[in-house]
Design a protein with these regions (language model features):
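C-terminal motif of bacterial Sec signal peptides marking the signal peptidase cleavage site
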Residues: 23-25
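Catalytic-loop region of hydrolases
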Residues: 30-125, 131-134
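Accessory cap/linker subdomain of secreted extracellular hydrolases
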Residues: 49-52, 258-367
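Short, surface-exposed "cap/lid" segments of acyl-processing enzymes
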Residues: 119-126, 130-165
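Alpha/beta-hydrolase active-site loop
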Residues: 190-213
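Primarily recognizes the serine-hydrolase "nucleophile elbow" in alpha/beta-hydrolase
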Residues: 205-215, 219-278
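C-terminal catalytic histidine-bearing segment of alpha/beta-hydrolase fold enzymes
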Residues: 350, 355-361, 381-434
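Short beta-strand/loop motif that positions the catalytic acidic residue
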Residues: 370, 375-382
Length: 434
């Protein structure tokens, strides 16, 4: 992948200082009367397209888990056998999320920013910023979201559960990723780590000067990174990008990564060798992502069962359906019923090319070890992202400053709720230390 010529942060900040003079009459106070969409901005900054204020007395109706309103999801997963392996209940976790949300009013800003696509062409992407309505924050948290199916679940279109942390005094930044939000008509390059890491970091680079010019006060420059599932792996890729290319400009306070496919090849090969995919949509998602994101000259029609290949545009690329709905449409967890005979043949030339791309896009294949402190969470009961990812990370990153939290926390989504709850606790402890 070619090297991108970024505008230095120092230049962005000098632009922001000049525009701050124009914005000096805009104050937050107690009235929360700043219209962010009307503020003058630089073309390289985040551009607000919609704004709303939320009191968060309860989980918003557009706060989803697998396409189901989060407020209802606790009741749904209480019935799951996988949940009963957890040491806590769905109801208690959901209530805890509600409890720590009842602190401040927040402002949600959906908007666009510039980044690059898999061909290295400029592309306008979208995302959401959630901040305390008084305009005062402790730090910025850059969040990489988990795997979604429908565009309604893209952060710019909904209220991510992690956004509740804004009420603790954090600015939350949520990129949609290429293929969602304003680019929903494009194929998402699933698990193409270097590209998605750039897309995520570009939003931070666009939001930071915008917030400064708007008068948002962030007490500390060091940022936090956070993500679960696909977002967990991508969060580690963002950490790598910052520590490799932005170490003088961006300082990381801490990284929170949970349930991530840090070894994409091992995750996918797990489906093939066991001939079981508990999360069926992952099979076509990974294959399509590797082909599109790495410009591989491979024909998916030869590698998938006809009924999957013929429906992938409708089921997946239309962005109309949640992952749960697509899993139901696929109708099987048997991998050889999803992949063709050639697709199941790990010795074939085509699968070999796929596996090379998966290795390239596995964060554990990088010649790198995290420098900033990391909190790495994984449920040992995870049926979607095999626990082998976390155990391999522990073996690989032996000298890194990592706090591991491995336990029987239920399935993948149950682990997600536990992860968010544990991050909230760690953030509270961090504030007490200061």
């Amino acid at each position: 992948m070619k090297s991108k010529k970024y505008i230095p942060i120092a230049k962005l900040l000098s632009i922001s200082l000049s525009l701050t003079l124009l914005l000096s009459s805009c104050t937050f106070g107690d009235n929360f009367d700043v219209d962010f969409s009307s503020l003058p901005t630089d073309s390289t900054w985040f551009k607000v397209t919609s704004q709303r204020t939320s009191t968060l007395d309860e989980l918003p109706a557009d706060c989803y888990i697998e396409g189901v309103p989060a407020a209802e999801y606790g009741q749904k997963i209480e019935q799951s056998p996988m949940w009963r392996t957890s040491s806590t209940s769905a109801a208690s976790v959901m209530q805890e999320i509600l409890d720590f949300s009842n602190r401040r009013t927040v402002i949600e800003l959906s908007g666009t920013y510039w980044s690059v696509d898999e061909e290295w062409n400029d592309v306008q992407l979208s995302g959401k910023v959630v901040l305390p309505a008084d305009g005062k924050a402790e730090r910025i948290i850059l969040v990489s979201h988990y795997t979604i199916g429908s565009n309604a679940e893209a952060p710019s279109r909904c209220f991510p559960i992690e956004a509740m942390l804004a009420k603790m005094g954090y600015v939350m930044i949520f990129p949609d990723y290429l293929g969602y939000g304003v680019t929903a008509d494009r194929v998402h390059p699933y698990l193409v780590m270097d590209l998605t890491a750039i897309n995520v970091l570009d939003m931070y680079l666009a939001v930071r000067p915008f917030l400064e010019a708007a008068g948002v006060e962030v007490a500390h420059d060091e940022i936090l990174l956070m993500g679960y599932s696909q977002g967990g792996a991508n969060t580690m890729a963002v950490q790598h990008l910052i520590e490799a290319a932005y170490y003088d400009e961006i300082k990381i306070r801490r990284v929170f990564a949970g349930g991530g496919p840090y070894d994409v090849l091992a995750t996918y090969d797990h489906f093939v060798t066991r001939d079981t995919a508990d999360y069926p949509i992952a099979v076509p998602l990974v294959m399509q992502g590797m082909i599109i994101g790495n410009n591989l000259d491979l024909n998916m029609e030869q590698l998938m069962q006809p009924y999957v290949y013929e429906n992938i545009d409708y089921w997946v690329n239309s962005k109309q359906f949640t992952t749960a709905q697509v899993n139901k449409a696929i109708g099987t967890k048997i991998t050889h019923n999803i992949l063709s005979e050639k697709g199941m043949d790990r010795t074939s030339e085509e699968v070999s090319e796929l596996y090379k791309a998966m290795t390239t896009n596995s964060i554990l294949s990088y010649s790198w070890e995290p420098q900033a402190p990391v909190y790495l969470f994984h449920s040992m009961d995870d049926e979607v992202v095999t626990f082998a990812n976390a155990s391999r990370a522990r073996v690989k990153w032996t000298n890194a400053n990592i706090q591991y939290n491995f336990g029987h926390y239920g399935g993948h989504i149950q682990g997600y709720l536990r992860f968010v709850s544990s991050v909230k606790t760690l953030l509270e402890q961090d504030r007490e230390i200061k």
